[in-house]
Design a protein with these regions (language model features):
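Acidic/polar, glycine-enriched structural segments that form the non-catalytic walls/loops
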Residues: 1-350, 585-588
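Active-site core of glycosidic bond-cleaving carbohydrate-active enzymes
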Residues: 355-384, 512, 525-671
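Non-catalytic C-terminal accessory modules of carbohydrate-active enzymes
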Residues: 78-131, 137, 613, 617, ...
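Alpha-helical scaffold segments in carbohydrate-active enzymes
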Residues: 323-330, 381-388, 453-465, 502, ...
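The feature captures the catalytic groove of carbohydrate-active enzymes
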Residues: 257, 347-355, 401-449, 460-540
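Helix-terminus loop motifs that line ligand-binding clefts
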Residues: 332-347, 373-432, 438, 444-449, ...
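C-terminal capping/lid segments that line or modulate ligand- or cofactor-binding pockets
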Residues: 25-53, 57-59, 362, 409-410, ...
Length: 764
């Protein structure tokens, strides 16, 4: 593997710690120290700003704006949308004797920053020595309320060490925020109001006409003055400091947008402010700790080292998987069917806040086994945006539903035609997600009310996008781009053909079952979508005659002609060339057999039980050395398959990469935001990789394989109202139901009945 860790943060099982401040890592740290609660998010930028390289960003889930594009050809989108920064509520200025605190220019020492995964808080401490020799110890605390998700909190603590005197503090709320990528503020006229202890502002986006309200209660010691102009409202006070006396300044924030409230957002904001006033920061922090205590009680993954010599390496893995779990819990909990999971969550502007097909293929398993209702909400987002998918298919001269490669609101937002028009995997990923959810939950009500309609419209799209080759007498997809985005406009991409085959067949199967089980619902659906009687049979015919490029020994060819491409030794690529999109000519990446991310291996992972071990082995051995992992989703897929094939050294190596991808900046782009969807794959790396869970068969299957340097691995999963606790060591795996009725599973191919009594299965 050509990439290497760039280690900066200290290792701790429950914290991420930055000891000392290196300006070169400023943006990386901002991403790592991001906070969120599904509704709002904020990067770990300095409250006081300053001359430090920074992407200041507070974001609200569902807030975006739009811009028109020049369109040359039919099928290419003529407008796009993108997440924009929301109201700046951390806004703080601190001055002493005319000198303003600025860590890019000020003298400071004893700097430490700490993300507490148990408490859900970010704390920063340092000692400021002014030009006049005065010393002030400062502590900045912030957290986003995981229960009342429109609320955020900031506390600044100041303590003079060697003087008695005043410090001028300004705190504010501002919509005068600039989208860095477009160098533009997308907020229009702003309504503002201020009293000494309350600041309020409301604004509207330029084209999407979305409104946001941001208000803050302030506890500024001393007499304060307010200032309101343009898009900014502030309060300023002279705060008296003395040695041994710590002074706290609290800010309690409310953020709402009109997608959450009625027509009168200003009144809704005032009502929410009145409710938040009754809750102190300390009370909110206690509730925050209780929330995270409950989360970790059911969702923690605990890794113990085999011995002291392994302790350091395992500690890094433990920190990595907890960091991943923490960020997933911050990003999405199923609170709204209006939202999906952006590739960067609410941690940065990269990818414009868009959700991709990663949601169903990579994120969904985490929620299926930890929060099934959230998994359902993710699929309902796709149902609610089905009308946009129908329109997109029409743009592409097809029938049915073509789900977008990139979106916030359901419309295709990717301006690159080679991705928006050639990548068909979003639609088949939705089909797969529906199948996986129903397979694990047996939620037929969802399937017949929502899923079936999506499935048949996806099948319609596949049936009109597919082509028939007279030469080979088979169907296939032509002019496509598979998951490996280093090869475009190819024919018969194996992933695209295989997933299309499964989607077509599943849609026909569901309609058959629905006609028998729920004839009235079936009839209503047929009437709604004007389903022709011969359509399902045609889908089966295409599926039965789909071309899957494959050698006699079951090595799948990624696409027509792939085996003839020139070879690239990926280990010869210098680390300084990454990310390749930033350093290589765009067309250069398409010329060889170098793969961005798993393509063939991806469908072997998704439908794992459909392939024998030898098929997986021959394909892994061929494609793994050709994969450069420029997609953050890639390492975990390889680790899971390597563990299954008993290549444990490779599995452990890829696991370290997957869990610490952002913490150790493997792809050299953590500065842009966290790789949220790949973080979900780090969880899968544990559960599907080392525990060997397979969830695509008739019952849950486990084949535990513990890494050599681990003494024990413990975690829990939810399944059909049950909580299954699993504890693995080198010799055995212990299963126990903590909740729910007895359950039959397979372990190493043998059926085992789980009950509330521990049952031990020896390692094989």
């Amino acid at each position: 593997m050509a990439k290497a860790a760039d280690v900066y943060f200290q290792v701790d099982p429950w914290k991420v710690i930055e000891q000392g401040f290196d300006p070169a890592y400023a943006r990386v740290s901002e991403s790592i120290f991001s906070l969120g609660n599904e509704s709002i998010g904020v990067r770990g930028c300095f409250d006081e700003g300053g001359h430090v390289d920074s992407l200041r960003g507070a974001y609200t889930n569902g807030i975006y704006d739009m811009e028109k594009l020049s369109r040359s050809y039919k099928g290419i989108i003529d407008k796009t949308h993108f997440m924009i920064p929301s109201a700046e509520w951390l806004m703080t200025t601190i001055s002493v004797d005319g000198e303003t605190l600025d860590l890019g220019q000020s003298q400071f020492s004893d700097f430490t920053r700490e993300l507490n995964l148990r408490a859900g808080t970010l704390t920063r401490r340092f000692l400021w020595t002014t030009k006049s020799g005065k010393q002030i110890r400062l502590t900045f605390l912030r957290f986003l309320d995981m229960v009342q998700r429109e609320r955020a909190y900031q506390r600044i603590t100041l303590e003079a060490l060697n003087f008695t005197g005043s410090v001028t503090v300004t705190s504010g709320v501002s919509f005068n925020v600039v989208h860095e990528g477009r160098q533009k503020c997308f907020w229009q006229e702003t309504r503002i109001d201020a009293t000494p202890d309350c600041l309020m502002a409301q604004s509207c986006t330029t084209l999407s006409n979305q409104e946001e309200f941001c208000g803050a209660w302030l506890t500024l010691p001393g007499e304060s003055t307010t200032f309101a102009e343009g898009k900014t409202v502030t309060a300023t006070a002279d705060v008296l400091l003395a040695p041994g006396q710590a002074v706290q300044i609290d800010k309690r924030v409310v953020v709402l947008f009109n997608g959450q409230q009625g027509d009168d957002l200003w009144q809704s904001g005032q009502d929410a402010m009145a409710q938040s006033k009754a809750v102190s920061l300390d009370e909110a922090q206690a509730a925050q700790r209780a929330y995270w205590d409950a989360y970790w009680h059911t969702s923690d993954i605990c890794i113990e080292p085999k011995d002291e010599s392994m302790a350091e390496a395992v500690a890094a893995e433990q920190q990595g998987i907890r960091f991943c779990s923490f960020q997933l819990a911050q990003t999405y909990n199923g609170g709204s069917m209006r939202h999906n999971i952006g590739a960067k969550g609410l941690t940065g502007e990269a990818y414009n806040g868009h959700a991709f097909w990663d949601t169903e293929s990579c994120c969904l398993p985490f929620y299926l086994f930890t929060n099934p209702e959230a998994a359902k909400s993710l699929l309902l987002f796709r149902y609610n945006t089905l009308p946009m998918a129908l329109e997109r298919a029409k743009m592409l001269d097809c029938k049915g539903a073509c789900y977008p490669i990139a979106t916030l609101n359901g419309d295709e937002a990717c301006p690159l035609w080679q991705h928006a028009s050639l990548q068909l995997q979003p639609s088949t990923a939705v089909s797969y997600g529906i199948w996986h959810y129903v397979h694990l939950t047996d939620d037929k009500a969802f399937l017949y009310r929502y899923g079936a309609e999506m499935l048949l419209q996806i099948a319609r799209f596949q049936a009109t996008r597919v082509g028939f080759s007279e030469k080979i007498g088979k169907y296939g997809f032509f002019g496509v781009m598979g998951p490996d985005e280093f090869h475009m406009m190819v024919n018969n991409n194996a992933y695209t053909n295989y997933m299309g085959m499964r989607a077509l067949r599943y849609a026909a199967d569901v309609l058959d079952a629905m006609r028998a089980d729920a004839p009235e619902t079936y009839a209503a659906l047929c009437e709604k979508v004007q389903l022709a009687s011969d359509e399902p049979a045609q889908w089966r015919h295409i599926a039965d005659n789909m071309y899957i490029p494959e050698t006699p020994d079951h090595l799948f060819e990624q696409h027509d002609g792939f085996f003839e491409l020139p070879h690239t030794d990926i280990n010869s690529i210098p680390v300084s060339d990454f990310p390749l999109y930033d350093h290589w000519a765009y067309d250069r990446i398409y010329r060889t057999d170098m793969i961005k991310q798993p393509d063939v291996l991806m469908f072997l992972y998704l439908y794992n039980s459909s392939f024998d071990t030898e098929t997986k082995r021959i394909n892994y051995d061929f494609y793994q050395p050709r994969t450069i992992h420029e997609s953050s989703l890639s390492p975990a897929i390889h680790s899971i398959l390597a563990a299954e094939l008993d290549k444990m050294d490779e599995a452990v190596s890829f696991f370290g990469y997957a869990t610490r991808l952002d913490l150790d900046n493997y792809n050299r782009n953590t500065r842009e935001g966290l790789h949220i969807t790949s973080i979900a794959m780090a969880w899968a790396n544990i559960v599907y990789g080392f525990a060997g869970l397979r969830s695509d068969d008739t019952m849950l299957r486990f084949a535990p394989r513990l890494p050599e340097r681990w003494k024990r691995l413990t975690f829990s999963v939810m399944y059909r109202g049950r909580v299954i606790a699993i504890s693995m060591d080198a010799d055995k795996t212990v299963f126990q139901l903590k909740q729910g009725d007895k359950l039959a599973v397979q372990v190493y191919g043998e059926t085992v009945e789980l009950t509330d009594e521990p049952i031990s299965v020896q390692r094989q």
